[in-house]
Swiss-Prot record:
Component of the N-Cor repressor complex, at least composed of NCOR1, NCOR2, HDAC3, TBL1X, TBL1XR1, CORO2A and GPS2. Probable component of some E3 ubiquitin ligase complex. Interacts with histones H2B and H4. Interacts with MECP2; bridges interaction between MECP2 and NCOR1. Interacts with USP44. It comes from Homo sapiens. The lineage of its organism: Eukaryota, Metazoa, Chordata, Craniata, Vertebrata. Residues 41-86 form the F-box-like domain. The F-box-like domain is related to the F-box domain, and apparently displays the same function as component of ubiquitin E3 ligase complexes. Residues 120-135 have a biased composition (Low complexity). This is F-box-like/WD repeat-containing protein TBL1XR1. The gene is TBL1XR1. Widely expressed including the pituitary, hypothalamus, white and brown adipose tissue, muscle and liver. The keyword Phosphoprotein applies. F-box-like protein involved in the recruitment of the ubiquitin/19S proteasome complex to nuclear receptor-regulated transcription units. Plays an essential role in transcription activation mediated by nuclear receptors. Probably acts as integral component of the N-Cor corepressor complex that mediates the recruitment of the 19S proteasome complex, leading to the subsequent proteasomal degradation of N-Cor complex, thereby allowing cofactor exchange, and transcription activation.
């Protein structure tokens, strides 16, 4: 048997990633030098650490079931071993003794019951058994009802309305629809991005373009074996940009051909966005910097070294001005050509996970591990609203495509927040109040996305469920349970399909047409 610390560290690192502890995974990966190991992550299946621990637990349970001489232990386990039980010293001997004691008690109780039963009349005995049976049965039903998630059968999306796309060999962290056609891009821990053709005249899930992320070693292109962490289509739908844990950003054609490799970051890229004009790409990295790239030449136009810790997210305000947030709890607004931030927002007391400008570019929303959602304006230093309602970390936020300056000007502007407290909240930002709390999820919610008309909100959680909500009433209108925890949800341009990427390597497409 051979176990190396690199192997153990890699399995722990993957477990943290798969469980949604992205910041912890990043810190552990840096401290344990994961990037310097020779382990091919694409070959390691999802949930590998849990799988090997379960096998170890089964081995200990087998030990408990066998005597020292190799014969089968005649006790019967009264309950399964927990993981903590299994690592306790002398667990085999203590469990076997506990089983013997329990068996002796049961035998004594059975003998006493038999003696008592023999002295009673048969009719009375039968009546007692019937009463006990009804009581126990009712108790069982009540427990089952409590454990099940209450989702109305009428809202469940039938299997014939869900297409499951398989091909990725590891968890799929991100997905995004092409803005002009039914092409769905996905990015995975298997060091590939994929483009799936979901148009009516295609062969659906059978057509996938594999975008392999390679690095140059010894004059050859070899797989990077690093996660694809971010991707974004340009507004014309002709180019796809990807960011990777290998530190490179890449530009691909929609046909899957590599157009440019952008290399100036000194570590993993966490976020990446095209500007609306399509001439610049913005990236955020663990090296504490953000970079504006020229999409035509692949050259870095300007690097912004203002954060004191890894940059986690970026968002364009205009074609040359953007905001960035970081684990340093700060938000900087920067402009191409300026050698310092044009605005800095401070007020969060923990890592700032995501930032988003509203459709007009006037208000900036931010969410944090400090459990707050804050709204900022370039006209003042302090936040306009400090929204506190979630009781765990807020992972992401999205503005609705409604209100002034949008295609839906007569609908009210809303903001959605997704939290590790398993809830999604919809906010009226003008009044600074929560208008709906959406509570059907059972695990942390990692992604929310508004439909193009703003009438519906999709949410994806690690409980494997995608829920579709009516934004006006807060009612659940569609629900789908996949085969893995959901990392990302997104709507196509027509607003009739929702894509979702999952921890088991699957990508599902939900057809919401009647």
């Amino acid at each position: 048997m051979s176990i190396s610390s690199d192997e153990v560290n890699f399995l722990v690192y993957r477990y943290l990633q798969e469980s949604g502890f992205s910041h912890s995974a990043f810190t552990f990966g840096i401290e344990s030098h994961i990037s310097q190991s020779n382990i091919n992550g694409a070959l390691v299946p999802p949930a590998a650490l849990i799988s090997i621990i379960q096998k170890g637990l089964q081995y200990v349970e087998a030990e408990v079931s066998i005597n020292e001489d190799g014969t089968l232990f005649d006790g019967r386990p009264i309950e399964s071993l927990s993981l903590i039980d299994a690592v306790m010293p002398d667990v085999v001997q203590t469990r076997q003794q506990a089983y013997r004691d329990k068996l002796a008690q049961q035998q004594a109780a059975a003998a006493a019951a038999a003696a008592a039963a023999a002295s009673q009349q048969g009719s009375a005995k039968n009546g007692e058994n019937t009463a006990n049976g009804e009581e126990n049965g009712a108790h069982t039903i009540a427990n089952n009802h409590t454990d099940m998630m209450e989702v109305d059968g009428d809202v469940e999306i039938p299997p014939n309305k869900a297409v499951v796309l398989r091909g990725h060999e590891s968890e799929v962290f991100i997905c995004a629809w092409n803005p002009v056609s039914d092409l769905l891009a996905s990015g995975s821990g298997d060091s590939t991005a994929r483009i799936w053709n979901l148009s009516e005249n295609s062969t659906s899930g059978s057509t996938q373009l594999v975008l392999r992320h390679c690095i140059r070693e010894g004059g050859q292109d070899v797989p990077s074996n690093k996660d694809v962490t971010s991707l974004d289509w340009n507004s014309e739908g002709t180019l796809l940009a990807t960011g990777s844990y290998d530190g490179f950003a890449r530009i691909w054609t929609k046909d899957g051909n590599l157009a440019s490799t952008l290399g100036q970051h000194k570590g993993p890229i966490f976020a990446l966005k095209w500007n609306k004009k399509g001439n610049f790409i913005l990236s955020a990295g663990v090296d504490k910097t953000t970079i504006i790239w020229d999409a035509h030449t692949g050259e870095a136009k300007q690097q912004f070294p203002f954060h004191s810790a890894p940059a986690l997210d970026v968002d364009w305000q205009s074609n040359n001005t953007f905001a960035s947030c970081s684990t340093d709890m700060c938000i900087h607004v920067c402009k191409l050509g300026q050698d310092r931030p044009i605005k800095t927002f401070q007020g969060h007391t923990n890592e700032v996970n995501a930032i988003k400008w509203d459709p007009t570019g006037n208000l900036l929303a931010s969410c944090s591990d400090d459990m707050t959602l804050k709204i900022w304006s370039m006209k003042q230093d302090n936040c306009v609203h400090d929204l506190q309602a979630h009781n765990k970390e807020i992972y992401t936020i999205k503005w609705s495509p409604t209100g002034p300056g949008t295609n839906n000007p007569n609908a009210n502007l809303m903001l959605a927040s997704a939290s590790f407290d398993s809830t999604v909240r919809l906010w009226d930002v003008d009044r600074g109040i929560c208008i709906h709390t959406l509570t059907k999820h059972q695990e942390p919610v990692y992604s929310v996305a508004f439909s193009p008309d703003g009438r519906y909100l999709a949410s994806g959680s690690f409980d494997k469920c995608v829920h579709i909500w009516n934004t006006q009433t807060g009612a659940l209108v569609h629900s789908y349970r996949g085969t893995g925890g959901i990392f990302e949800v997104c709507w196509n341009a027509a607003g009739d399909k929702v894509g979702a990427s999952a921890s088991d390597g699957s990508v599902c497409v939900l057809d919401l047409r009647k």
